[in-house]
C-alpha cells in the first residue's frame, strides 16, 4: 500500500492531464446487453455490492484522485493508463521490455478489426456492439493522432467472409448485423469476383462483406498510446515487477528485481500471457496461452492489386489475412494454414496410425523464453492458402514471419476483476485473441472500474475471474 490512505492522497487538477470529456462506452454497454453477456438473470443489487468492495477513488473538482500502478504496457495497459490519467489519477506504468515489444501479444505490425462474431457461443450480441464502437474509436484515434506520429493507425479496408456453404458462423453473423443495424452486403461469388478478381471465390455460396471493418497498426498504436499517456503525466518505468503480498484485504507494495519497492493505492495487472507466471496458483488453470503464427508475403513488383485499398481483409475457413499497407508495404498477411492433401491409398489399404504425441517443450508456455520462429511446414500451409485463393501470389517471396502468444480463458470472456483477497489489486486482460481490437474501449472500462464506477453490474459479473478451471492434466499445446 502507499504511505497514505487512498482517500487522503488526492491528485489535484493538473493541466497536463487531458481535459477530454468522458466517453460514452459504458452507457453503450447497457443493462440489456449486460444481461446477454452474463447469460443469466442476476440480482443487480447483489452484484453491485460485490463489485464495489473496497473504497472507490474520491473525486475532487469532478476528477478522481489517488495513485495507480499499471503493470504491462501492452494494448490494454497503455489505454488503461491513459484513461486513468484522463480521470485525474496519478499513474505509473511499468513494463519489463517496453511498450509494443516483440514478445507481447500486440507487438506485431498489424491487427484486423471487424465485428463478425457469430461464432461466439456466449455474449455474441455484446461483442458485436463493442466491436462496432471499437471501430469508431480507432477511426477517431487515427484522425486525431496520425499527423503527429507520422503514421496511419487505422485503415478502412472492409472485410469479406467467404464460405462454400452456409455455416452457423456466417448465418448468425448476418443475423446479428441485421439486428444491430450494421452495414454489410451479401454478395454472390460472381459479384465478389467482379469486385476483387485477384481473390478466387468460385463455388462460394456465402460472401459477406463488412465495409467498415479495417486493419490497425498494432505496435505503432501501443507505442503512441503510451506516448500520449506520458504527455498527460503518466510516469513510465522499465523493469520486471513482482506482485506484493496480500495481507489484511489489500496488496502491499510491488517490488522490482533490484529490491526497489513501488507503492500505490491500487494496482492493475494487464499482463497478457505473463499472468500464469505472475499468479500461478490463480491463473495457471484458468487460461491458456497458445502461439499464433502469421506470414507476410511480398506483393508483386508493379502490381498494386494486393495492397490497400485494392483488396479487403478476408476470412476463409480457418485462415484470415489482409492487404499490404502503405507506406512500408510489409507484406500481404496470412494467418493460418491449409493442411496438405492426404496421400493416395488403395481402397483396401489401412490408414496410417496416428502420429506419436510430441512432448511439449516447456519453453513454449513461457512468453519470456518461447521461440517465435515458424516451421517450414507452417509456411507451406500458408502458401497453400495463396495457391487456392490468391494464385498470383502462389510463388511470392516470404518477407517475414511473426508469432505471438495470445490468451484464452476457460469461459471465453475477458477478465476484469479484483484479485481474491485484495480490494486494491486488479487483473485485466485475457483477450481471447481479440484483445487488441477492443483495447481502445476496454481501457476506459477498466479505468472506470478501478476508480469505483461499476457500470452495468451484469457486465461486471460476466468479466469476473472464472471459477471453472481447465483440466490440469490436459496438455497445453495449442498453437495455430
Model-derived features: positions:
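C-terminal catalytic lobe of FAD-dependent flavoproteins
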Residues: 384-480
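Active-site substrate-recognition segment that forms the wall
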Residues: 82-86, 150-155, 271-422
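Dinucleotide-binding Rossmann-like beta1-alpha1 core, especially the glycine-rich loop
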Residues: 110-195
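N-terminal Rossmann-like FAD-binding beta1-loop-alpha1 element of flavoenzymes
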Residues: 67-92
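N-terminal secretory signal peptides
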Residues: 1-24, 45-51
